[in-house]
Each structure stands twice: as C-alpha cells, then as structure tokens.
C-alpha cells in the first residue's frame, strides 16, 4: 500500500509522523520504503543519523521529487509491502502527484485556527484527487495538542473536523511531548523510548491507519 503524509502548513509534525510510522512498520517485519519527497530532506537526514548510530532495524529511504512522482511510486509499490511518502508542508506537485496512486493520505493538523483553515484547503486537494483515484481514503489527525486539560483547542478542532463527511477523523490525538524531539535526536521512534504516553499515542494511531481499528483506550493528555 501507499500512504501519503501531507499538509498545507508546516510545523504540524508531518515528517516526525512519517519517521515513526516507517520505523514501526520495519519493527513489525514489513518491507517498508520511506519516500522523502520534501525538499528539506528531514526524513533522509534522520535515516543517516539512525545508520550512524547502528540502530536496528535499518529503515529504507529514497529521495524523490517532481510532478511524475506517481509513476515512480506505481513502480515501487511492486517491490515493497508498504510505501510511506513524506511530502512538503504546502500544496506541491509531489503531493498532488502521489495522491493519484495512493490508497491513503494522512493529514496532520495542529489545533489552531490558522492550521484548520489551511487543512480545509488540503481537503479540497484530496477531494479533487478522489475524482481521479476513487479508492483514496483521507485521514486527519490532531497533532501537537496542549497537555493542559483546561485548554479545549484539541476538542474544538475535533468538532470542526468532524463536519467533513469525506474525511476520516482519527480518534487518537498526539500531544506535545518532549519525547517526540528526543527520539529524533537519538535516531529512534517514540516507541523505542521509555515514554509510555507518546508510545501509546503512536501505537493507537498506527492501528487506526493500518489496521482500521478504533482505539478502545483514549490517549491521556497529562505529561
């Protein structure tokens, strides 16, 4: 399968999500390729860092850009069990091209009004892609949510996003935690650290995306 992770706005943790999903897939023994289609090359840098530290399992990363990305992905999907594509935090040729052959697109969004407005534009892009690729499923996940229970922005964002019928809103919320930054510096995913809350959040999201499951345990916003 091909999973595209995209966004209309940077800073939502898009590359971090791609990295964690590919490491988790590799740890399950799934032959997975991470395609870094973002000119910033963050996923490729992470892969090099992980290789330098000799951390197993090794993840496979290719850098691919351009409006013909869909053709390359169509060829690569016959060689790998799973392909995860990290596109830039904007409306790009790579995002639109990859959606032509993807089965799933995951849109991370921070619970701020500016991010929600940008995500509405992303929904328009995925809806257009579905006209050409009817099997494409659109998921959206709240990221970098505040851990303070008195801050209701995540709940408000969930309510707003639930009003889009062609989009599947993930039940899992990813909260802002130091573990996300620490894991990247160490060349690891959060599931390879001893942060049980970040681990639980990522595990539940993984199950929602790849297993189609609905989490039975709500994530805990407390630090």
Describe the residue ranges of each PLM region.
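Walker A/P-loop
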Residues: 15
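Beta-strand-loop-alpha "switch" segments that mediate conformational coupling across diverse proteins
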Residues: 144, 158-188
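Inter-motif core of Ras-like GTPase G domains
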Residues: 94-113
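P-loop/Walker-type NTP enzyme "switch/lid" segment
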Residues: 2-8, 12, 20-89, 93, ...
């Amino acid at each position: 399968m091909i999973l595209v992770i995209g966004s209309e706005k940077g800073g939502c943790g898009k590359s971090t999500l791609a990295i964690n999903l590919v490491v988790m897939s590799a740890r399950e023994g799934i032959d997975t390729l991470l395609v870094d289609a973002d000119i910033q090359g963050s996923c490729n840098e992470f892969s090099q860092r992980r290789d330098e530290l000799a951390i197993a399992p090794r993840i496979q990363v290719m850098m691919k850009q351009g409006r013909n990305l869909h053709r390359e992905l169509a060829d690569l999907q016959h060689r790998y069990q799973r392909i995860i594509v990290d596109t830039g935090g904007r409306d790009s040729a790579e995002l639109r091209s990859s959606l032509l052959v993807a089965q799933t697109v995951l849109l991370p969004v921070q619970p701020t009004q500016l991010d929600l407005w940008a995500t509405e534009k992303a929904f328009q892009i995925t809806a257009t892609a579905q006209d050409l690729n009817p099997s494409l499923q659109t998921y959206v996940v709240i990221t970098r949510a505040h851990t303070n229970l008195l801050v209701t922005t995540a709940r408000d964002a969930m309510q707003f996003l639930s009003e889009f019928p062609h989009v599947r809103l993930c039940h899992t919320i990813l909260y802002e935690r130091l573990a996300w930054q620490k894991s990247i510096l160490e060349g690891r995913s959060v599931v390879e650290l001893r942060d049980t809350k970040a681990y639980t959040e990522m595990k539940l999201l993984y199950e929602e995306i790849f297993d189609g499951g609905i989490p039975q345990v709500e994530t805990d916003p407390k630090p």
